[in-house]
């Protein structure tokens, strides 16, 4: 097992500054080459402690901001306009990047596409839901209205 310090958030593993133990192959072949982690040292541990103190102070402010944004996201549905066939099937699927753009266009704030989770592929016109992870403790459910785009003549 390899002991590492994460330099970025890794899904299912931790956030920046966390000390984790992973299998050697995962560390050697994935985390270290991509710059997601560095090797743990005693000096690095002191640096991690100072980073965690600073992060704890920021987390309180970020939590309040995330809760406010979650309330805003849940207050109104987000409308996405896509080209669709006669029976309501979309030409292509709605992606997380499309949802992020629609949220920003609706004036509900900026959301990273990697923090959006779609429960299933959205390939039809209608009402759907998406989960947005704004903070470790705050997950907002966004109502999506997918409508067919009007034909241009």
Curated annotation (Swiss-Prot):
Per UniProt, the keywords (alphabetical) are:
Ribonucleoprotein, Ribosomal protein, RNA-binding, rRNA-binding
For this entry, list what GO says about its biological process.
translation
Q: Does the keyword rRNA-binding apply?
A: yes
Gene3D superfamilies given for it?
Answer: Ribosomal protein L9, C-terminal domain, Ribosomal protein L9, N-terminal domain
Q: Which domain of life is it from?
A: Bacteria
Q: What GO molecular function terms would the record report?
A: rRNA binding; structural constituent of ribosome
Q: Which Pfam families match?
A: Ribosomal_L9_C (PF03948), Ribosomal_L9_N (PF01281)
User: Which positions form S-S bridges?
Assistant: none
Whether Transport counts among this entry's keywords is no
| Record's GO cellular component terms | ribonucleoprotein complex; ribosome
Its annotated function is as follows: Binds to the 23S rRNA.
Q: What family, per the record? A: Belongs to the bacterial ribosomal protein bL9 family.
Protein name in the entry = Large ribosomal subunit protein bL9
């Amino acid at each position: 097992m390899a002991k590492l310090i994460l330099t970025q958030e890794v899904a299912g593993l931790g956030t920046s500054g966390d000390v984790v133990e992973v299998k050697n192959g995962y560390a050697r072949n994935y985390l270290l080459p991509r710059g997601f982690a560095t090797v743990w040292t005693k000096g690095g541990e002191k640096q991690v402690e100072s980073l965690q103190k600073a992060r704890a102070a920021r987390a309180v402010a970020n939590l309040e901001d995330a809760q406010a944004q979650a309330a805003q996201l849940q207050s109104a549905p987000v409308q996405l306009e896509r080209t669709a066939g006669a029976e309501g099937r979309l030409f292509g699927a709605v992606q997380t990047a499309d949802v992020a753009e629609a949220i920003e266009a609706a004036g509900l704030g900026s959301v990273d596409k990697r923090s959006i989770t779609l429960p299933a592929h959205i390939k039809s016109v209608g009402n759907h839901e998406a989960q947005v992870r704004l903070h470790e403790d705050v997950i907002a459910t966004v109502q999506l209205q997918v409508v067919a785009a009007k034909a241009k003549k």
